[in-house]
Amino acid sequence: MKLALSQRGEASSDAQRRQLNCDAQRRGPPGGLRINARALVAALFSALLGTIGSAAQAQPFETPPLPAPPRSLAIATPTEQRLPNGLRVVLAARPGVRLVTAQLLVLAGAEVDPPQRAGLASLAAGLLTKGTQGRSASAQAREAESLGGSLDSSAGWNQSQVSITVTVGQLNPALGLLADAVMRPTFAQAELERLRAQVLDGLKIAYSQPATLATLATERLLFGSRPYGHPADGTPASLPRITRTDLQALHRAHYRPDNAVLLLAGDLDDAGALRLAARHFGAWRGPQTGAATASRLALAALPTPAPAAGSSASPAAAAAAAAAPTPWLAIDMAKSDQATVMVAVPLPPLGADRATASVLNAVLGSDFSSRLNQEIRIQRGLSYGVGSQLDARRDGGALRVSVQTRNASAAEVVALVRTELDGLIDTPVPAAELAARKAALVGAFGRSIETTAGLGSALRSLVVAGVPVSELRARIEALSAVTADAVQRFAAAYLGAGARRVVVAGEALEFSASLQAQAPAQTPLSSPSRRFVTLTPATLDIERDGAWPDR
């Protein structure tokens, strides 16, 4: 045992020494002074509060400054020129920003997909960056990267496009890449098979989701067998049918200068834009036939355009809104954890009412403060994903409400959406709410065109819709001029109960009975029991008319 010498000169063990130390700690410091730890902490805290209070008295509270007055947004008027071969050259100049976004648009998209070839336009656009007569796919990517950009291609309903954003000094070679991709694609069989396999793999996952099936079904109920009614990305049945010959035929018919637009946004002037366009696209020639025209939708079944602000709603539109309703559709997805609710109405080409439709959509459901989000998410907690979308296509579009919710609450959500739509028809939007929504739209538009890519996107929307590019400058004024009366008249013309398509995808056992109880009593079908139709994913043939209820 280890020994230590005690104060009395006696040996002590380690244990005895530790006991002496403990006794000394309990006795406290010499002289009998005892320190209470809790009291010490309290004293220090009080002193700190006193210091803070003194500082607060020394520096009185200051009212934060008011928001600065709104600043007008300076937007140069876009200009349009044309090459001898018919190519339109549109420029949105942004002096001082040493970037340029270039887009080559072909005014043909998924609407020109032939019967039984859904997804053809999408595949064709995707393959534009997968090899040309002079460059492999990897060479295209390497050259774009060497210029500091990325060569991207895609197709929408009304257009196919290739785009790139580079510095001004790299625009010349970048336009060479764009021209090569659009004019000389090879549609190599190996690349076709690779892209087709990727899309099919994606569809396998997508088709297992309620949101995907609800969206596809809604499109079909909105547009029927007309071009907008088919899946733009294709289906598991249509994609395997598409051949390289199909791709080449579509390219010959629609990829031509008299059906194309070169959009440039950035630090460039008109003369420079036209010179570069002529250098890279001047030799482009289309077939020696009449200009290709994208297949147009037969709009007889859609309501006529809404009146401009200041006039009364047209009788034809009001009559269409009161027409017999389309059957409601439930898609039974057994064991689905949640349901997707979609309520949609068809819209004609909007024309002068684009701003009114945008404001109505903002009030209804386009942001966090909108009515749908306030009622369904914040007040009732029925969804984390609720909103509305305005889809303004060239030949008519739609307003869609989409909600992700529990299966058991799907019917309740449908009723809430119907109530909000009715509210827009029955009651003018209060002035404060209207002003807030318009301010949000104006601010969002200003932010969206801060970059050359955003400016180019706004310009593309106008060109594809067939709206004069000069309307870009008038966007803010048009939004600011929308009145509550105009919103209410638009709602009355297009949001009526007879125009609504209702689709719910999920575990139908949990919502079908309560949903069917809401379905309108009138029906355009011979059998009233067909006002509510339930399908399963296996029977939901989105290419075959006979599988669908009459519209």
Task: List each language-model region with its residue ranges.
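M16/MPP (pitrilysin/insulinase) zinc-metallopeptidase core fold and M16-derived inactive scaffolds
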Residues: 101-165, 230-231, 367-382
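Mature N-terminal segment immediately following signal peptide/propeptide cleavage
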Residues: 71-103
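Bacterial N-terminal signal peptides
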Residues: 39-52
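Charge-rich, well-structured scaffold segments of protease-associated domains
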Residues: 45, 59, 82, 139-292, ...
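His/Glu-based metal-binding/catalytic segments typifying zinc-dependent metallopeptidases
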Residues: 105, 290-369, 538-551
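Short, low-structural-confidence N-terminal segments
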Residues: 3-4, 54-84
